[in-house]
């Protein structure tokens, strides 16, 4: 299910560089992480939903590319983001 406006605002408030920040890699990765976790829960219930599984794989790939970009630009921001999101890299 899609994120509501309130959920997006809360996530962007935590991870964005400022209140209305939607474009920074940190904000985008945080939103993707929430969508990935929601979709993962959906797929636990609906194991044969292959269309959503493909969407999940696309989201994971997009998040991986954004994280790779952040790691190349600023390693400290990358490490901080990984720790705050609880990702295991």
UniProtKB/Swiss-Prot annotation:
One of the GO BP terms on file: translation
This protein's UniProt keywords: Ribonucleoprotein, Ribosomal protein, RNA-binding, rRNA-binding
Record InterPro entries: Ribosomal_uS15 (IPR000589), Ribosomal_uS15_bac-type (IPR005290), uS15_NS1_RNA-bd_sf (IPR009068)
PROSITE patterns found in the cross-reference section: RIBOSOMAL_S15
PANTHER family (UniProt xref): RIBOSOMAL PROTEIN S15, BACTERIAL AND ORGANELLAR, SMALL RIBOSOMAL SUBUNIT PROTEIN US15M
Task of the protein: One of the primary rRNA binding proteins, it binds directly to 16S rRNA where it helps nucleate assembly of the platform of the 30S subunit by binding and bridging several RNA helices of the 16S rRNA.
Name the record gives this protein: Small ribosomal subunit protein uS15
